[in-house]
């Protein structure tokens, strides 16, 4: 059962004894799922971002063209996690372009590079204050902590109070995900 892997918040009244992953899965899964388009950290958003070395393979290069061509509704934004001004600007630029193109959701992927939760909190709080529609469309925050959780434990409860968290490659040892 999950009790050997997940520890509930003290005083939450949650008990994982006798509970299994299947207990938390949707019984009648949807037939269709939205596709998430990854906006890489060096991907060109506008013509000003072009370097001249872009592929000439017939596929879009600029984000607005991708959105229009493929009807993108969900954008995963890769961030640096070490340059708050750049990360915030990237989220705003992608968010505005996405909203103009009918985006439903976006996510912020900090790529296991954040050294302190306040870094993410400050970006999220600024989005909430200055770009509330972009903040509202930010479905979750991915990897707001180091890859090696064992060696760089962070208390990210303050981040999860703002937005749900998603971890993938950091979750390679559940002993440290508590």
Regions found by a protein language model. Give the residues of each.
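N-terminal capping/lid subdomain adjacent to the active-site entrance of alpha/beta enzymes
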Residues: 1-132
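Generic hydrophobic/aromatic pocket-lining and core-packing "Φ" positions
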Residues: 63-64, 153, 176-177
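Catalytic beta/alpha-barrel core
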Residues: 75-83, 107-112, 135-149, 162-173, ...
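Short, surface-exposed basic-aromatic patches at helix termini and helix-loop junctions that form
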Residues: 92-100, 155-161, 178
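Generic hydrophobic alpha-helical scaffold/packing signal
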Residues: 124, 142, 154-157
């Amino acid at each position: 059962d999950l009790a050997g892997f997940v520890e509930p918040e003290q005083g939450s009244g949650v008990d994982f004894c006798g509970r299994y992953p299947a207990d938390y899965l949707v019984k009648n899964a949807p037939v269709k799922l939205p596709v998430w388009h990854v906006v890489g950290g060096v991907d060109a958003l506008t013509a000003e971002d072009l370097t001249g070395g872009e592929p000439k393979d017939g596929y879009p290069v600029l984000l607005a063209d991708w959105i229009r061509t493929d009807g993108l509704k969900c954008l995963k934004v890769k961030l640096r996690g070490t340059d708050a001004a750049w990360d915030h600007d990237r989220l705003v630029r992608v968010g505005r372009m996405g909203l103009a193109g009918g985006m439903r959701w976006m996510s912020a992927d900090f790529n296991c590079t954040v050294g302190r939760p306040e870094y993410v909190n400050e970006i999220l709080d600024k989005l909430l204050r200055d770009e509330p529609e972009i903040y509202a469309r930010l479905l979750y925050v991915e990897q707001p902590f180091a890859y090696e959780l064992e060696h760089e434990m962070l208390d990210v409860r303050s981040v999860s109070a703002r937005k749900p968290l998603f971890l993938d490659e950091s979750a390679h040892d559940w002993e440290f995900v508590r």
